[in-house]
UniProtKB/Swiss-Prot annotation:
Key words of the record: ATP-binding, Kinase, Nucleotide-binding, Transferase
SUPFAM superfamilies in the cross-refs: GHMP Kinase, C-terminal domain, Ribosomal protein S5 domain 2-like
Protein's UniProt name: Putative 4-diphosphocytidyl-2-C-methyl-D-erythritol kinase
Organism: Staphylococcus epidermidis (strain ATCC 35984 / DSM 28319 / BCRC 17069 / CCUG 31568 / BM 3577 / RP62A)
Catalytic activity: 4-CDP-2-C-methyl-D-erythritol + ATP = 4-CDP-2-C-methyl-D-erythritol 2-phosphate + ADP + H(+)
Residues reported in the UniProt entry to bind ATP: P93, V94, S95, A96, G97, L98, A99, G100, G101, S102, A103
EC numbers: 2.7.1.148
Domain of life the protein comes from: Bacteria
Family: Belongs to the GHMP kinase family. IspE subfamily.
Catalytic center residues: K9, D135
Segment forming the signal sequence: none
Length: 282
């Protein structure tokens, strides 16, 4: 039995630069991890099947599951002639902008690499993982990084300063393709990628909070005004910085002090079913 942990990611920044010829958007984003995790275990089978064992109403256990897709890709690429049972204990909320599915897929690739003794480097796994998800290369490494291209170009950055994180996911679903479709690339915008990288380089917490920026945030907020209400609530209750992660709908607030973080948690807990008080990992 092999075990892997799959931490959630958050965006410090997210910029979309232009629409590529392959239909994807060219992006630049700074991401890190938080200590909200899914836990996965992997056990060999003798029947050559890939079986995903998960008890969750909104997560498929068939070939639509990203962990299944990752395993299928690994089996095909490395000619694996055995089976595997992938058990997922899920804490990361679904369709939240926290890369829960990608984190599970990345953990599956790392786990199968160990289970079957494939000897692949993390770089090799990341290069393979981009075939099934743009966040998977980042999730393979689980280190603070700036990701460019489709997400496959990963440049590591220093770990962020220590901080509490309050994550709040409203009870709405957001389709990432719909958000990108609604994005107007001609609109003026400011995303503070360089300021964010400087903040991490200098371990400057306040500069980091001032650099939080996401080009998709106003698009998702226009679709779902509750996202803005949660962000405003967090800032009014003392968050040092707040931002929507990914294409949403999860919003997070940063706080240096535990009491400050608990105040924010209590303020948003009444209006969101899924609220988490965690720490930055990086």
């Amino acid at each position: 039995m092999i075990y892997e942990t799959a931490p959630a990611k958050i965006n410090f920044t997210l910029d979309t630069l232009f629409k590529r010829d392959d239909g994807y958007h060219e992006i630049e984003m700074v991401m890190t991890t938080v200590d909200l995790n899914d836990r996965l275990s992997f056990e060999k089978r003798t029947d050559n099947k890939i079986v995903v064992d998960i008890e969750h109403n909104y997560v498929p256990n068939d070939n639509k599951n990203l962990a299944y897709k990752a395993a299928d890709l690994m089996f095909e690429r490395f000619n694996i002639n055995e089976g595997v049972t992938i058990s997922i204990d899920k804490d990361i909320p679904v369709s939240a902008g926290l890369a829960g599915g990608s984190a599970d897929a990345a953990a599956t690739m790392r786990g199968l690499n160990r289970l079957f003794g494939l000897g692949q480097s993390l770089d090799a796994l990341a290069a393979l993982g981009i075939q099934i998800g743009t966040d998977i290369p980042f999730c393979i490494y689980n280190q603070t990084a700036v990701c460019t291209g489709r997400g496959e170009q990963v440049t590591f950055l220093k770990r962020p300063p220590s901080a509490w994180v309050v994550l709040a996911k409203p009870n709405i679903g957001i389709s990432s393709p719909d958000v990108f479709k609604a994005l107007d690339l001609t609109e003026e915008h400011i995303v503070h990628n360089e300021k964010c990288k400087q903040a991490l380089e200098n371990n400057d917490y306040h500069l980091l909070c001032n650099s939080l920026s996401n080009r998709l945030e106003p698009v998702s907020m226009a679709m779902h005004p509750d996202i803005k209400k949660i962000k405003d609530n967090m800032l009014q209750c003392g968050a040092d910085g707040a931002l929507m992660s990914g294409s949403g709908p999860t919003v997070y607030g940063l706080a240096q002090k535990e009491r400050q973080a608990k105040n924010i948690y209590n303020a948003v807990n009444g209006c969101c079913n899924e609220v988490y008080l965690v720490r930055l990992l990086g």
